[in-house]
């Protein structure tokens, strides 16, 4: 078992793209931890619409007001990444009951792979509970206005890449 720091949390995701819901979760979690590492996953199986480095850059811009938050891209197993940064907590968001089954399965697998790390679930603020990266991408792809769901830099990146 690795030595972990429960004051360091990893918030993993594809962040394709980062949304106001993700930003809200990090903003509310930031005071709870000494450090939050936002881990932007390569996730080739998901076929991200934005390249990894661009997703990292957009997340850094969106979260730059938090001194204790860093954004790092990774292309390894999440368990390896968590151990690499020495985190003792995995942060996950639960928007609705529909998220629960998948998140419960992932938390159980992570508990098996990294038993020294706890998974902490946070729910979004009500105004962000319906936002998902896939919906934001789809609305943007079809020419809809996503400015209420993501930062301006993300909106511009989606317009350019979709």
From Swiss-Prot:
Cofactor: Mg(2+)
Pfam families (UniProt xref): CTP_transf_like
Gene Ontology BP terms: coenzyme A biosynthetic process
Site residues by UniProt (Transition state stabilizer): 22
Pathway this chain belongs to: Cofactor biosynthesis; coenzyme A biosynthesis; CoA from (R)-pantothenate: step 4/5
GO cellular component: cytoplasm
Catalytic activity of the protein: (R)-4'-phosphopantetheine + ATP + H(+) = 3'-dephospho-CoA + diphosphate
Matches recorded under CDD domains: PPAT
InterPro entries, sorted: Cyt_trans-like, PPAT, Rossmann-like_a/b/a_fold
Ligand binding (ATP): 14-15, 22, 93-95, 103, 128-134
Cell membrane keyword on record: no
Entry-linked PANTHER family: PHOSPHOPANTETHEINE ADENYLYLTRANSFERASE
Assembly and interaction partners: Homohexamer.
Role description: Reversibly transfers an adenylyl group from ATP to 4'-phosphopantetheine, yielding dephospho-CoA (dPCoA) and pyrophosphate.
NCBIfam families: coaD_prev_kdtB, cyt_tran_rel
Similarity-based family: Belongs to the bacterial CoaD family.
Name assigned to this protein: Phosphopantetheine adenylyltransferase
Lineage, uppermost ranks: Bacteria, Pseudomonadati, Pseudomonadota, Gammaproteobacteria, Lysobacterales
